[in-house]
A protein has these predicted regions:
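Helix N-cap/capping motif at the beta->alpha junctions
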Residues: 36-42, 65
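Charged, solvent-exposed alpha-helical segments that act as regulatory interaction surfaces
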Residues: 27-30, 125-129
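Conserved sequence signature across two-component system core domains
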Residues: 7-8, 37, 54
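Two-component/phosphorelay signaling modules centered on CheY-like receiver
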Residues: 10-35
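Non-catalytic signal-transmission and effector/linker regions of two-component phosphorelay proteins
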Residues: 1-3
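CheY-like receiver
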Residues: 45, 51-127
Length: 132
């Protein structure tokens, strides 16, 4: 079961992501555990390398997404990070922390499914390799 963190300070974007993930679960017969964090400092408060996928907003009130991603990478090289941003220019910065992808706001279901298909394939490939 894929563990997903959503780190986003805008409630509308949180709700859109959850709605899209639930729709994806039904369409693809997948199951996710999703946890919401309202800011970068919230996920780092008690971070453990449990997440397979982290949706991370770039602009947040207390700690921006890029700083949060750098701190996550210090303790977790495996979590896939997908940045959520209104500005495509931040995508280049994401490569410095080995981000999987970025999604432009407002989040569109088709954009999420393309990225999620790739993530699920990577996750199941890693899981099967670990079992072998």
């Amino acid at each position: 079961m894929l563990k997903i963190a959503i780190v986003e300070d805008e409630r509308e974007c949180q709700e859109a992501l959850i709605e899209h993930l639930r729709k994806y679960e039904k369409e693809k017969n997948e199951a996710f555990i999703v946890r919401i964090f309202n800011d970068g400092i919230d996920i780092l408060d008690d971070y453990s390398a449990d997440y397979d996928l982290i949706f991370l907003d770039i602009h947040m009130k207390y700690q921006d997404g890029m700083t949060t991603a750098k701190r996550i990478r210090e303790v977790d090289a495996n979590a896939q990070i997908v940045f959520i941003t209104a500005l495509a220019q931040y995508a280049i910065e994401g490569y410095k922390v080995n981000a999987l992808d970025f999604i432009l706001k407002p989040v569109v279901y088709e954009q999420l499914t393309t990225m999620q298909d790739r993530q699920c394939t990577m996750y199941f490939t890693r899981s099967q390799t670990a079992r072998a």
